[in-house]
């Protein structure tokens, strides 16, 4: 992974860079998690894959309910809520990880569509934009990594400060409540085991926005090519064959983008649906904990956790919203591209292409609702609803009495 840090900065034109390089970090993380993306796993990596899959999809999600059953009476309210929000997130993480395992081949298929789109980027300005896109998305992934690592570390420090474990997962034969030694042992065990899952989560949470953001760059490049079709400075505007070939290239690029959406949509659909549902519940629990129970030091970790939760949905919703607007601009650009001065064949092709462009590229969650900023706002409203219900039930007083 560290060999790819050069991708943080835009590469010069002389250096070969592809759109698929924008997800190099994310792919390397998935490979380290056990996904055999290159079909080159030996015995050692296959054994690691069994351990990784078992821990991420079985042991970690189950460890929270087991701990609740055994030690529920010993949970203070703020620790119970803090553990519950992480429990919900790990269930969603297990679902996303399983989905990526099932649809691993679609990630490579999407990258092959990126390779096709790169073939249409022949001008130096287009190549520079691709390099800028790779650097921007690489930084976006690093933002996920920094926020997630900051959350893991701050939770560990807060736990040590309050003489408790950071995540409250279940470990047989270890009871951190007995003495300090067992508390330190479980704290650092959790930091490395749950921390590994958090490391994998940087990929499972970021892959939708990484692919969609790269797609948007190619949509904007296509818009520039369509605008250039009707540009008076276009030297080939008087050559019908050249103009028709340029138009056909735009159509092929658009078709490749639609194929890309078909490839990536099944992966995004189910995972983001679960993410929206879980995210609203998690944010509601966070609000209850922060307002009613958490102290100042714990609130810092909660704020970092809120940032991590928002990263799971907001950037993707933003880019999906932007793509819908960009698709409308594609149709407007083609309509104003002086197509009426070309020959009949060109005009007929433009009309058919225009009909296709009027259908925006949209991503949906289980074909129930569109992924956009309006949906993200509704998730936030649901979080306020959860908090309002808890406040109306005087949850703080009831939990304090039980404590």
UniProtKB/Swiss-Prot annotation:
Pfam families: 7tm_6. It is found in: Cell membrane. Residues 71-83, 161-193, 293-299, 394-403 are extracellular. InterPro entries: 7tm6_olfct_rcpt. Residues 1-49, 105-139, 215-271, 321-372 are cytoplasmic. The keyword Transmembrane helix applies. GO terms for molecular function: ionotropic olfactory receptor activity; odorant binding; olfactory receptor activity. The chain crosses the membrane at residues 50-70, 84-104, 140-160, 194-214, 272-292, 300-320, 373-393. Odorant receptor which mediates acceptance or avoidance behavior, depending on its substrates. The odorant receptor repertoire encodes a large collection of odor stimuli that vary widely in identity, intensity, and duration. May form a complex with Orco to form odorant-sensing units, providing sensitive and prolonged odorant signaling and calcium permeability. Interacts with Orco. Complexes exist early in the endomembrane system in olfactory sensory neurons (OSNs), coupling these complexes to the conserved ciliary trafficking pathway. This is Odorant receptor 43b.
